[in-house]
Amino acid sequence: MNNLIDTIKKIENILYSLERILKQECHNLLKSKTSNEEILELIKRKKILFKKLIILSQDRLCLEKEYNIFPPYESNNKLNNYWKKIINTCLILRKLNLKNKIIMNKKFYLNQRFLELSSSYKKSVTYNLDGNLEI
């Protein structure tokens, strides 16, 4: 049973780390002079944490089968408390992720729109003195 508790604690720690990274990503997206390298570094760190989370979740499932206990762990108060913390953290992560997606879409939509306007401005169609079209 202690193995299961340790695994759930590790999962909780990883989720808190993901929360910090998502908050940092949000902060970087809101700054106007953030380089793409900083955002890519955060994405790499998130990938590493997600891989660890997947491995720990598989371990948790195996331990649950072994001990014949499943979420929300009503029979064990300690596990139940940790599980509630994990659920709350997951809800926070979901909100942060949605917020980051919205910010990212707005930021890159504006950049794309600027590039489209810039290219259309440079490639404007005009008439020359002879009345012929020029591009």
Swiss-Prot record:
Keyword terms: Bacterial flagellum biogenesis, Cytoplasm
Q: Does the keyword Cytoplasm apply?
A: yes
Q: Name one Pfam family in it.
A: FlgN
User: What is the residue range of the signal peptide feature?
Assistant: none
Q: Does the keyword Cytoplasm apply?
A: yes
Annotated InterPro entries? FlgN-like, FlgN-like_sf
May I have one GO cellular component term?
cytoplasm
One GO term (biological process): bacterial-type flagellum assembly
**Where does the protein end up?**
Cytoplasm
Q: Please, which domain of life does this record's source organism belong to?
A: Bacteria
The text of the family note is: Belongs to the FlgN family.
What function does the entry list? Required for the efficient initiation of filament assembly.
Q: What is this protein called?
A: Putative flagella synthesis protein FlgN
What is the originating organism of this protein?
Answer: Buchnera aphidicola subsp. Acyrthosiphon pisum (strain APS) (Acyrthosiphon pisum symbiotic bacterium)
User: Gene behind this chain?
Assistant: flgN
